[in-house]
Amino acid sequence: MYEHMTEVKQYFTKFGGHKLAAGMSLAKRYDSLEEDVEAFRKELNECCTLTEDDLIPRVHIDVPMPVSYATKKLAEDLNLLEPFGVGNPKPLFAQKDLHVIRGFKMGAKQNFARNKVRTPEGTEVEMVFFGNIDHFADFLDRKYGIGSGASLYTTYCDFPVSVTYQLSINTYRGNESLQFIMQNYC
């Protein structure tokens, strides 16, 4: 980011940055802030080397692993790798062909869900999803027909999806259990 900022440094009184963030103070060059911003935006876009492909989000999976392989012990062992963050992301696993069979909205605002899924081998587990449940419902509607997303929370379903997930330990009323946290789906 810093390298590209140097290409338009004439627009700044000061600037700095690194791979994940940048900061700058815009120099006054024209009569109005709008003119300064527009000139800066124009030149920045002319120097931009991003392609459409660069704008496609990428998901990096650590291990394709069936949910039936996951254990509480594995989740506990993974916690030894903490602290997780930008330079040390929490491990991400994936499984294809899970069947979402039931969903339950949760939270005071009903904005996250607990989805029951069945593996190809017939094992059923629950996955918590803290992502946008409306987007997930829209995805199901596009893939399986209008109304599919809404039906997930009202009746039993059978929607094959592939997911990425993380493992954690859920502690509730003093009891610990393995928890699957769904991150991405397709």
At which residue positions do the language-model features occur?
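Acidic, two-metal ion nucleic-acid-processing modules in DNA metabolism proteins
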Residues: 1-15, 19-186
